[in-house]
């Protein structure tokens, strides 16, 4: 079986090596001629999968995309040809949720304003919004969810209006897809009027799409209201964010909230599982076996951690300050934004760090937060 795979997709050899011959290709320049005799095609978002690419192939058994979105894939064409397709929804959700949570802990320390006791509004309750809520709820934080589409679909969770979040939330974390038209348009969902309506001292975290906030309006409002604190991982006009906006953010990064080693591996692993299912063979590989050993074997806790100690545990896994500093130093360079993304040392997730604790205090919340080893 000939497996054509984007050369930048990780962990392909250990997962798919037993299933066929792996042929790495440049996903951006892939041609119909290269695909002609492939049995399996594994791509990323840089490859347009359509009739032009696949019309010369009559033996394709499976197309997989190690991505959350499917904008680059002509799903109707694949369905017409009866070619099975799978992507990797939610593969980086844990990474995004932990990134947002860590950013909130960092702001809490910087401004001596504890996260505990605050109300967090999450706009968008899909995979990444749900992962963020999971972290916050594990820590005992009250969460308000806004997602009119999920609510209309009958999702059993409690939802509130965006106006309620604007009025009540101390922190707002954005997790919606970009939608440019229709009833639930998200482009400039946070326009000048909504930004001005935010509660005093609101923290605004954006880990979804830059266009969800009107960036020009954000500059204007932030200059008028220094009480607003910003964490921006995404920007209008990527890869060239407005240079005057970056200094106004407390933490600024180049669209890397989802960049974890676990998330990267999970995307490929989900495609491996799907192909094994299609071939009716056992998926006997383990996701954990793919990942390198974490550089800290375990952390012994003498007591259940307070918020300052929790931030230190989080920093053992990922220190947001490092990426923030690097981004500020490089984003104005030619290709600085994309270069930092391409060369990013994918961080680990909380699960990489084992905690050892023999005390009597209740520490299940650390396990719920994602750390391993707690209470075991």
UniProtKB/Swiss-Prot annotation:
Biological pathway: Cofactor biosynthesis; pyridoxine 5'-phosphate biosynthesis; pyridoxine 5'-phosphate from D-erythrose 4-phosphate: step 2/5
Location in the cell: Cytoplasm
The keyword NAD belongs to this UniProt entry's keyword annotation: yes
Residues involved in substrate binding: 45, 67, 259
Active site residues per record: 209, 238, 255 (proton donor)
Gene Ontology biological-process entries: pyridoxine biosynthetic process
One Pfam family in the UniProt entry: DUF3410
Enzyme superclass (EC): oxidoreductase
Keyword field contains Cytoplasm: yes
This protein's UniProt keywords: Cytoplasm, NAD, Oxidoreductase, Pyridoxine biosynthesis
Recorded catalytic activity of this chain's protein: 4-phospho-D-erythronate + NAD(+) = (R)-3-hydroxy-2-oxo-4-phosphooxybutanoate + NADH + H(+)
GO cellular component: cytoplasm
Subunit structure, interactors included: Homodimer.
Biological role stated in the UniProt entry: Catalyzes the oxidation of erythronate-4-phosphate to 3-hydroxy-2-oxo-4-phosphonooxybutanoate.
The protein, known as: Erythronate-4-phosphate dehydrogenase
């Amino acid at each position: 079986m000939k497996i054509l795979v984007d050369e930048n997709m990780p962990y392909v050899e250990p997962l798919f090596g037993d299933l066929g011959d792996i042929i790495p290709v440049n996903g951006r320049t892939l041609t119909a001629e290269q695909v002609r005799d492939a049995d399996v095609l594994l791509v990323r978002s840089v490859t347009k999968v359509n009739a032009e690419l696949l019309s010369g192939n009559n033996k394709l058994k499976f197309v997989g995309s190690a991505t959350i979105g499917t904008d680059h894939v002509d799903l109707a064409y694949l369905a017409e040809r009866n070619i099975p397709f799978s992507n990797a929804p939610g593969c980086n959700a844990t990474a995004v949720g932990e990134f947002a949570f860590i950013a909130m802990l960092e702001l809490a320390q910087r401004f001596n304003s504890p996260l505990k006791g605050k109300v967090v509004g999450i706009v968008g309750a899909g995979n990444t919004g749900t992962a963020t809520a999971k972290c916050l709820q594990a820590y005992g934080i009250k969460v308000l969810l806004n997602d009119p589409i999920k609510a209309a679909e009958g999702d059993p969770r409690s939802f509130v209006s965006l106006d309620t979040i604007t009025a009540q939330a101390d922190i707002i974390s954005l997790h919606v897809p970009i939608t440019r038209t229709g009833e639930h348009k998200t482009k400039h969902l946070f326009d000048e009027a909504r930004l001005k309506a935010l509660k005093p001292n609101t923290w605004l975290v954006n880990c979804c799409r830059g266009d969800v906030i009107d960036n020009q309006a954000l500059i204007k409002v932030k200059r008028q209201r220094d009480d607003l604190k910003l964490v921006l991982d995404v920007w209008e006009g990527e890869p060239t964010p407005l240079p005057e906006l970056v200094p106004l953010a407390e933490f600024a990064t180049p669209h890397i909230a989802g960049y974890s080693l676990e998330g990267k591996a999970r995307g490929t692993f989900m495609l491996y599982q799907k192909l094994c299912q299609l071939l009716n063979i056992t998926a006997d590989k383990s996701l954990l076996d793919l990942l390198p050993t974490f550089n800290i074997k375990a952390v012994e806790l003498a007591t259940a951690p307070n918020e300052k100690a929790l931030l230190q545990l989080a920093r053992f896994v990922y220190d947001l300050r490092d990426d923030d500093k690097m981004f500020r130093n490089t984003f104005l360079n030619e290709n600085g934004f994309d270069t930092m993304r391409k060369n990013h040392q994918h961080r680990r997730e909380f699960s990489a760090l084992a905690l050892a604790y023999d005390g009597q205090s209740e520490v299940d919340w650390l396990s719920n937060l994602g750390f391993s080893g707690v209470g075991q």
